[in-house]
Amino acid sequence: MKPWAAFHLIFLVASSLEGEVSNYGTRGAQDTEPTCRTEHQCTRDKIILQSQPGIPGIPGVPGINGSEGLKGDPGPQGLPGETGFDGIPGVAGPKGDKGDQGDKGDKGDKGDKGDACILDDCPPTDVEVRNCQDLLEHGEILNGWYTIYPTKENPMVVFCDMETDGGGWLVFQRRQDGSVDFYLDWESYKKGFGKQESEFWLGNDKIHLLTSSGTQQLRIDLEDFEGSRTFAKYSSFSIGDENEKYRLIVGSYLDGSMNDSFRIHNGHSFSTKDRDNDTNKGNCAMMYKGAWWYFHCHHANLNGLYYKGKHANYADGINWRSGKGYYYSYKYADMKIRPQQSETTVS
C-alpha cells in the first residue's frame, strides 16, 4: 500500500470516531457513566485500529569508530614484480689495481707479405740484385745484412762480406762464440736458425736456391784461439733440394792456407741426428754431435760442438783434419759463396 493510501485510511477512521464521540456528548447525564461493568460487556464498544507500517525514519548519526584492533599476521609473499627500467649510470669508481697478465692467445693468421728490405739505403726495386756481388757492384761496400732477390718471388735477407778477398761474398754459415746450439734436427737445418749478430745457418732450402743457378765459388775461413787465420777456396759449390737430401756437389780445390778437407764429402747427402743419410752403419751426426755431408764419417765437421781449442773427445768439435786435426775446435768458422769470377784475388 502506498503511504498516501494508508494516511487516507487513518483519516477516515479518525473521522468516524469523532462522530461517535459527538453522539455520546448529546446524551443525558445518565450516559456519563459507562453502562458496561465487565470486559465482556464492553467488547462491542472497543475499536481496534490497524494500519500499515509508517514511513521509515531518517538514519541516525554514525557512531564513533572503535579502538584499533591487534596487528594481524603477515600475509603470504607476493609474486616477484617485473624488472624496472635501467637507472642513470653512476659516477665512475676509482681505478682498480692492475690485474695479472692473461693467458697467451691463439696464434693469429699469417700476415700479408711485406717489404723484405731492412736497410735505409735499399737499392731501387727496378735494379736486379740477385746476390751480394750485385750489391757490391751497385756501391754497397759495408759488411752487413741485405735483401737480395735470387728470384723475383723469393726475396731473401742475407749477410754480405764486402771485405774478404775482394768482397761480394754471401755468408751461409758462421760460428764465433758458441752462443747458438748447432746440434739440431733436420727441420731446423732445412729452414735455418741462429742469430744475425752472432752464429747462424742460413737454411738448406735457401742454400739450394742460391746455388741452383749459375756457378758459385766456395770459400771457408777458420781462425783458432791463438788468432791464426786460414782459408780454403773451391771452384764451385751447390746442394740438391730436399728430395735429393741436399746432396753436396763441390768443385776442385783452388787454393788456400789450410789444405783440403772438404772435397772428400762430395756427392754425399746431408745428415742430422734425426735423419741418418751417411754410409756408416751408425749415425755419424749423433756420434760427432753435428749435422753435415757425412760419409763414414768426416774430414771436416764445421757444425760440431763449440769447444775452446783442444778437446778430449774425438772429432766432435769444429774440426778440420788437414788443419789442426780431430782434437782441436776452432774459435771462428764461416762458409760463403760468390758467383764465379774469371779473376780472383786471394787474401
UniProtKB/Swiss-Prot annotation:
Biased composition (Basic and acidic residues): 95-115
A Pfam family annotated for this UniProt entry: Fibrinogen_C
N-terminal signal peptide: 1-19
Residue span, Collagen-like domain: 57-114
Keyword presence, Thylakoid: no
Modification note: Hydroxylated, possibly at Pro-74 and Pro-94.
Tissue: Expressed by the venom duct.
Name of protein: Ryncolin-2
Source species of the chain: Cerberus rynchops (Dog-faced water snake)
